[in-house]
Protein backbone atom coordinates (compact mmCIF):
# COMPACT_ATOMS: atom_id res chain seq x y z
CA UNK A 1 0.00 0.00 0.00
CA UNK A 2 1.38 3.44 -0.95
CA UNK A 3 2.03 6.09 1.67
CA UNK A 4 -0.59 8.35 0.03
CA UNK A 5 -3.23 5.63 0.36
CA UNK A 6 -2.44 4.99 4.02
CA UNK A 7 -2.63 8.72 4.79
CA UNK A 8 -6.00 8.92 3.03
CA UNK A 9 -7.34 5.97 5.05
CA UNK A 10 -6.15 7.48 8.34
CA UNK A 11 -7.74 10.83 7.50
CA UNK A 12 -11.03 9.13 6.57
CA UNK A 13 -11.02 7.16 9.84
CA UNK A 14 -10.33 10.32 11.86
CA UNK A 15 -13.12 12.18 10.08
CA UNK A 16 -15.58 9.36 10.82
CA UNK A 17 -14.65 9.50 14.50
CA UNK A 18 -15.07 13.29 14.45
CA UNK A 19 -18.47 13.00 12.77
CA UNK A 20 -19.61 10.51 15.41
CA UNK A 21 -18.59 12.82 18.25
CA UNK A 22 -20.25 15.81 16.62
CA UNK A 23 -23.50 13.86 16.12
CA UNK A 24 -23.48 12.85 19.76
CA UNK A 25 -23.17 16.54 20.65
CA UNK A 26 -25.99 17.49 18.30
CA UNK A 27 -23.62 19.17 15.83
CA UNK A 28 -22.45 18.55 12.29
CA UNK A 29 -19.16 19.12 10.50
CA UNK A 30 -19.17 21.69 7.70
CA UNK A 31 -19.12 20.05 4.27
CA UNK A 32 -17.95 23.16 2.45
CA UNK A 33 -19.67 26.16 0.88
CA UNK A 34 -21.81 24.14 -1.53
CA UNK A 35 -23.30 22.00 1.21
CA UNK A 36 -23.87 25.00 3.44
CA UNK A 37 -25.70 26.79 0.65
CA UNK A 38 -27.93 23.82 -0.18
CA UNK A 39 -28.95 23.36 3.46
CA UNK A 40 -29.48 27.05 4.13
CA UNK A 41 -32.84 27.98 5.59
CA UNK A 42 -34.14 31.52 5.39
CA UNK A 43 -33.28 33.57 8.47
CA UNK A 44 -36.22 35.87 7.88
CA UNK A 45 -39.44 35.78 5.92
CA UNK A 46 -38.28 37.54 2.72
CA UNK A 47 -40.07 40.79 1.96
CA UNK A 48 -40.63 41.85 -1.62
CA UNK A 49 -39.82 45.41 -2.71
CA UNK A 50 -43.55 46.06 -2.78
CA UNK A 51 -43.95 44.89 0.83
CA UNK A 52 -40.97 47.02 1.84
CA UNK A 53 -42.88 50.14 0.78
CA UNK A 54 -44.70 50.10 4.11
CA UNK A 55 -41.33 50.80 5.78
CA UNK A 56 -40.68 53.76 3.50
CA UNK A 57 -41.13 56.94 5.58
CA UNK A 58 -43.00 59.94 4.29
CA UNK A 59 -40.76 63.00 4.13
CA UNK A 60 -41.70 66.04 6.15
CA UNK A 61 -42.14 69.33 4.32
CA UNK A 62 -39.19 71.64 4.92
CA UNK A 63 -39.48 75.16 6.22
CA UNK A 64 -38.08 77.87 3.96
CA UNK A 65 -36.04 80.62 5.58
CA UNK A 66 -35.96 84.17 4.27
CA UNK A 67 -32.55 83.49 2.70
CA UNK A 68 -33.91 80.47 0.80
CA UNK A 69 -32.46 77.73 3.02
CA UNK A 70 -34.83 74.78 3.41
CA UNK A 71 -34.64 72.83 6.67
CA UNK A 72 -36.65 70.53 8.92
CA UNK A 73 -37.58 70.92 12.58
CA UNK A 74 -38.71 68.51 15.30
CA UNK A 75 -42.39 68.76 16.17
CA UNK A 76 -43.10 70.43 19.48
CA UNK A 77 -39.64 71.88 19.97
CA UNK A 78 -40.71 75.40 19.08
CA UNK A 79 -42.25 75.55 22.56
CA UNK A 80 -38.71 75.66 23.95
CA UNK A 81 -38.21 79.35 23.29
CA UNK A 82 -34.47 79.28 24.02
CA UNK A 83 -33.68 76.35 21.71
CA UNK A 84 -32.01 76.59 18.31
CA UNK A 85 -32.18 73.46 16.16
CA UNK A 86 -32.70 72.19 12.63
CA UNK A 87 -31.95 69.46 10.10
CA UNK A 88 -30.71 70.85 6.79
CA UNK A 89 -31.72 69.60 3.34
CA UNK A 90 -29.79 69.97 0.09
CA UNK A 91 -31.89 72.97 -0.94
CA UNK A 92 -31.17 76.66 -0.61
CA UNK A 93 -27.41 76.99 -0.97
CA UNK A 94 -24.76 78.15 -3.40
CA UNK A 95 -22.98 74.89 -4.31
CA UNK A 96 -22.96 73.62 -7.88
CA UNK A 97 -20.77 70.54 -7.41
CA UNK A 98 -23.71 68.18 -6.82
CA UNK A 99 -26.43 70.14 -8.55
CA UNK A 100 -29.19 68.04 -10.10
CA UNK A 101 -30.75 68.85 -13.45
CA UNK A 102 -32.78 72.02 -13.18
CA UNK A 103 -31.81 72.63 -9.56
CA UNK A 104 -30.59 75.93 -8.20
CA UNK A 105 -27.47 76.11 -6.05
CA UNK A 106 -27.42 73.52 -3.27
CA UNK A 107 -26.64 73.56 0.43
CA UNK A 108 -23.57 71.36 0.71
CA UNK A 109 -22.18 71.89 4.21
CA UNK A 110 -19.19 69.53 4.10
CA UNK A 111 -15.65 70.34 2.99
CA UNK A 112 -15.64 67.72 0.24
CA UNK A 113 -13.06 67.37 -2.52
CA UNK A 114 -15.60 68.28 -5.20
CA UNK A 115 -16.79 71.58 -3.74
CA UNK A 116 -15.15 74.95 -3.26
CA UNK A 117 -14.21 75.70 0.36
CA UNK A 118 -15.38 79.31 0.26
CA UNK A 119 -18.74 78.18 -1.10
CA UNK A 120 -19.14 75.71 1.77
CA UNK A 121 -18.28 78.42 4.30
CA UNK A 122 -20.91 80.66 2.72
CA UNK A 123 -23.44 77.80 2.89
CA UNK A 124 -22.69 77.30 6.59
CA UNK A 125 -23.29 80.97 7.24
CA UNK A 126 -26.61 80.73 5.40
CA UNK A 127 -27.68 77.80 7.60
CA UNK A 128 -26.64 79.61 10.79
CA UNK A 129 -28.66 82.63 9.69
CA UNK A 130 -31.71 80.47 8.91
CA UNK A 131 -31.61 78.78 12.33
CA UNK A 132 -30.48 81.58 14.65
CA UNK A 133 -31.10 84.77 12.69
CA UNK A 134 -27.37 85.57 12.65
CA UNK A 135 -24.89 84.30 10.05
CA UNK A 136 -22.00 84.87 12.49
CA UNK A 137 -23.25 82.36 15.08
CA UNK A 138 -20.22 80.13 15.88
CA UNK A 139 -20.55 76.61 14.47
CA UNK A 140 -18.79 73.71 16.22
CA UNK A 141 -18.13 70.51 14.28
CA UNK A 142 -16.10 67.34 14.81
CA UNK A 143 -14.00 65.12 12.57
CA UNK A 144 -16.39 62.18 12.42
CA UNK A 145 -14.77 58.75 12.70
CA UNK A 146 -17.74 56.37 13.27
CA UNK A 147 -16.98 56.04 16.97
CA UNK A 148 -18.79 56.52 20.26
CA UNK A 149 -16.59 59.46 21.30
CA UNK A 150 -18.45 62.53 22.56
CA UNK A 151 -16.77 65.84 23.43
CA UNK A 152 -17.96 68.79 25.48
CA UNK A 153 -17.67 72.00 23.46
CA UNK A 154 -17.57 75.71 24.20
CA UNK A 155 -17.29 78.85 22.10
CA UNK A 156 -13.52 78.42 21.71
CA UNK A 157 -14.06 75.09 19.94
CA UNK A 158 -15.58 76.88 16.94
CA UNK A 159 -12.17 78.34 16.04
CA UNK A 160 -10.14 75.25 16.98
CA UNK A 161 -9.26 72.21 14.92
CA UNK A 162 -12.25 69.82 15.04
CA UNK A 163 -11.83 67.01 17.56
CA UNK A 164 -12.00 63.39 16.43
CA UNK A 165 -15.41 62.32 17.69
CA UNK A 166 -19.01 61.66 16.65
CA UNK A 167 -20.87 63.57 19.31
CA UNK A 168 -20.94 67.05 20.82
CA UNK A 169 -22.58 68.48 23.94
CA UNK A 170 -22.71 71.87 25.61
CA UNK A 171 -24.49 74.03 28.15
CA UNK A 172 -22.89 77.21 26.80
CA UNK A 173 -25.26 79.63 25.05
CA UNK A 174 -24.61 81.26 21.72
CA UNK A 175 -23.05 78.42 19.70
CA UNK A 176 -24.39 75.78 17.32
CA UNK A 177 -23.28 72.16 17.60
CA UNK A 178 -23.31 70.33 14.26
CA UNK A 179 -22.97 66.78 12.98
CA UNK A 180 -22.83 66.00 9.27
CA UNK A 181 -24.67 63.21 7.47
CA UNK A 182 -25.44 61.91 4.00
CA UNK A 183 -27.27 58.68 5.05
CA UNK A 184 -26.22 58.15 8.68
CA UNK A 185 -28.67 58.98 11.45
CA UNK A 186 -28.47 62.34 13.26
CA UNK A 187 -29.79 62.46 16.82
CA UNK A 188 -30.33 65.69 18.77
CA UNK A 189 -30.96 65.69 22.53
CA UNK A 190 -32.21 68.50 24.78
CA UNK A 191 -32.19 68.78 28.57
CA UNK A 192 -35.14 71.08 29.23
CA UNK A 193 -34.28 71.68 32.90
CA UNK A 194 -30.51 72.14 32.76
CA UNK A 195 -30.56 73.86 29.36
CA UNK A 196 -27.97 71.55 27.87
CA UNK A 197 -27.94 70.10 24.34
CA UNK A 198 -26.16 67.37 22.39
CA UNK A 199 -25.79 66.17 18.81
CA UNK A 200 -24.79 62.66 17.74
CA UNK A 201 -23.77 61.13 14.41
CA UNK A 202 -24.90 57.49 14.34
CA UNK A 203 -23.87 55.33 11.42
CA UNK A 204 -24.21 51.58 11.84
CA UNK A 205 -20.79 51.36 13.53
CA UNK A 206 -21.57 54.16 15.97
CA UNK A 207 -24.98 52.64 16.62
CA UNK A 208 -23.43 49.26 17.45
CA UNK A 209 -21.07 51.07 19.83
CA UNK A 210 -24.08 52.75 21.52
CA UNK A 211 -23.02 56.32 20.85
CA UNK A 212 -26.44 57.74 21.74
CA UNK A 213 -26.82 55.73 24.93
CA UNK A 214 -23.28 56.45 26.12
CA UNK A 215 -23.58 60.10 25.05
CA UNK A 216 -26.60 60.58 27.29
CA UNK A 217 -24.57 59.00 30.07
CA UNK A 218 -21.97 61.72 29.50
CA UNK A 219 -24.69 64.38 29.77
CA UNK A 220 -25.66 62.95 33.14
CA UNK A 221 -22.05 63.18 34.33
CA UNK A 222 -21.29 66.63 32.88
CA UNK A 223 -24.57 68.45 33.44
CA UNK A 224 -26.50 66.36 35.96
CA UNK A 225 -29.10 65.57 33.30
CA UNK A 226 -31.97 63.29 34.29
CA UNK A 227 -33.67 61.07 31.68
CA UNK A 228 -37.11 62.42 32.58
CA UNK A 229 -35.95 65.93 31.62
CA UNK A 230 -34.62 64.90 28.22
CA UNK A 231 -36.27 65.03 24.83
CA UNK A 232 -34.71 63.78 21.60
CA UNK A 233 -35.19 64.08 17.85
CA UNK A 234 -34.01 61.52 15.31
CA UNK A 235 -33.44 63.25 11.99
CA UNK A 236 -33.65 62.08 8.37
CA UNK A 237 -31.31 59.26 7.38
CA UNK A 238 -31.33 56.22 5.17
CA UNK A 239 -34.42 54.09 5.79
CA UNK A 240 -34.90 50.36 6.01
CA UNK A 241 -36.27 50.53 2.48
CA UNK A 242 -32.88 51.54 1.06
CA UNK A 243 -30.23 50.37 3.53
CA UNK A 244 -28.98 46.93 2.50
CA UNK A 245 -26.07 45.51 4.49
CA UNK A 246 -23.98 42.38 4.73
CA UNK A 247 -24.12 39.46 7.14
CA UNK A 248 -21.28 40.97 9.16
CA UNK A 249 -23.52 43.89 10.17
CA UNK A 250 -26.22 41.49 11.36
CA UNK A 251 -23.60 39.60 13.37
CA UNK A 252 -22.43 42.83 15.05
CA UNK A 253 -25.96 43.85 16.05
CA UNK A 254 -26.84 40.37 17.30
CA UNK A 255 -23.70 40.33 19.43
CA UNK A 256 -24.51 43.68 21.06
CA UNK A 257 -28.30 43.83 21.42
CA UNK A 258 -30.81 41.20 22.47
CA UNK A 259 -33.25 42.82 20.05
CA UNK A 260 -30.63 43.08 17.30
CA UNK A 261 -32.15 40.49 14.99
CA UNK A 262 -35.50 42.28 15.06
CA UNK A 263 -33.93 45.34 13.42
CA UNK A 264 -33.40 43.44 10.16
CA UNK A 265 -35.59 42.28 7.31
CA UNK A 266 -34.56 40.14 4.36
CA UNK A 267 -35.67 41.69 1.09
CA UNK A 268 -36.25 39.92 -2.20
CA UNK A 269 -34.44 42.21 -4.61
CA UNK A 270 -35.04 40.29 -7.84
CA UNK A 271 -37.21 42.07 -10.36
CA UNK A 272 -40.91 41.05 -10.67
CA UNK A 273 -40.45 39.30 -14.05
CA UNK A 274 -37.59 37.17 -12.72
CA UNK A 275 -39.64 36.22 -9.65
CA UNK A 276 -42.67 35.23 -11.75
CA UNK A 277 -40.79 33.33 -14.48
CA UNK A 278 -37.62 32.00 -12.82
CA UNK A 279 -37.02 29.23 -15.40
CA UNK A 280 -36.51 31.83 -18.12
CA UNK A 281 -33.30 32.91 -16.40
CA UNK A 282 -31.77 29.53 -15.59
CA UNK A 283 -29.26 29.75 -18.43
CA UNK A 284 -27.83 32.91 -16.88
CA UNK A 285 -26.50 31.02 -13.85
CA UNK A 286 -23.34 29.02 -13.51
CA UNK A 287 -24.09 25.35 -12.70
CA UNK A 288 -24.74 24.91 -9.00
CA UNK A 289 -24.88 28.62 -8.25
CA UNK A 290 -28.14 30.46 -7.65
CA UNK A 291 -28.43 34.23 -7.82
CA UNK A 292 -28.22 36.39 -4.70
CA UNK A 293 -31.96 37.07 -4.60
CA UNK A 294 -32.27 38.48 -1.08
CA UNK A 295 -30.39 41.08 0.91
CA UNK A 296 -30.53 42.15 4.52
CA UNK A 297 -31.90 45.61 5.30
CA UNK A 298 -31.47 47.26 8.70
CA UNK A 299 -33.57 49.87 10.52
CA UNK A 300 -31.09 52.36 12.01
CA UNK A 301 -33.82 54.76 13.11
CA UNK A 302 -35.41 52.10 15.31
CA UNK A 303 -32.00 51.02 16.58
CA UNK A 304 -31.30 54.53 17.86
CA UNK A 305 -34.83 54.95 19.22
CA UNK A 306 -34.19 51.79 21.27
CA UNK A 307 -31.00 53.34 22.63
CA UNK A 308 -32.86 56.46 23.70
CA UNK A 309 -35.36 54.26 25.53
CA UNK A 310 -32.52 52.29 27.12
CA UNK A 311 -31.05 55.59 28.33
CA UNK A 312 -34.30 56.27 30.20
CA UNK A 313 -36.25 58.53 27.84
CA UNK A 314 -39.99 58.00 27.59
CA UNK A 315 -41.47 57.14 24.17
CA UNK A 316 -43.45 60.39 24.17
CA UNK A 317 -40.17 62.32 24.54
CA UNK A 318 -38.73 60.99 21.28
CA UNK A 319 -39.51 62.75 18.00
CA UNK A 320 -38.77 61.22 14.62
CA UNK A 321 -38.35 63.68 11.76
CA UNK A 322 -39.37 61.54 8.78
CA UNK A 323 -37.54 61.22 5.50
CA UNK A 324 -35.35 58.60 3.80
CA UNK A 325 -32.21 60.06 2.27
CA UNK A 326 -32.02 57.16 -0.18
CA UNK A 327 -35.57 57.66 -1.48
CA UNK A 328 -35.56 61.46 -1.59
CA UNK A 329 -32.41 62.36 -3.48
CA UNK A 330 -34.22 65.53 -4.55
CA UNK A 331 -34.43 66.71 -0.93
CA UNK A 332 -31.43 65.12 0.79
CA UNK A 333 -27.84 64.24 0.00
CA UNK A 334 -27.32 60.45 -0.03
CA UNK A 335 -23.94 58.73 -0.26
CA UNK A 336 -25.57 55.50 -1.42
CA UNK A 337 -28.06 56.95 -3.85
CA UNK A 338 -25.35 59.01 -5.55
CA UNK A 339 -22.79 56.21 -5.78
CA UNK A 340 -20.48 57.81 -3.23
CA UNK A 341 -20.36 61.31 -4.69
CA UNK A 342 -22.49 63.40 -2.36
CA UNK A 343 -22.57 66.61 -0.40
CA UNK A 344 -23.22 66.73 3.34
CA UNK A 345 -26.15 67.93 5.42
CA UNK A 346 -25.95 69.27 8.95
CA UNK A 347 -28.07 68.68 12.00
CA UNK A 348 -27.54 71.58 14.38
CA UNK A 349 -28.57 72.45 17.91
CA UNK A 350 -27.76 75.24 20.33
CA UNK A 351 -28.88 77.42 23.21
CA UNK A 352 -30.15 80.82 22.17
CA UNK A 353 -31.77 83.69 24.04
CA UNK A 354 -35.18 83.12 25.58
CA UNK A 355 -37.93 84.23 23.22
What are these regions (language model features)?
Residues 2-355:
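Active-site microenvironment for binding and transforming phosphate-containing groups
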Amino acid sequence: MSSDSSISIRVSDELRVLDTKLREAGLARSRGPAARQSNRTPRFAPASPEELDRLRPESAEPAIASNGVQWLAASGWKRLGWLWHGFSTRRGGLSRAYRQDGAQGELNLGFTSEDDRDTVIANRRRLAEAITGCADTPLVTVRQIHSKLVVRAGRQAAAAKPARADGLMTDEPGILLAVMTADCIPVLVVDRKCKAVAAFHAGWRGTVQRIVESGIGRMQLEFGSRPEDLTAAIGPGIGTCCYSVGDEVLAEFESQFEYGRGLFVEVDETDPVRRRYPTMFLNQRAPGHGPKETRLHVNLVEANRRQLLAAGLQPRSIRIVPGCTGCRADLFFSHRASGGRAGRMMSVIGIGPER
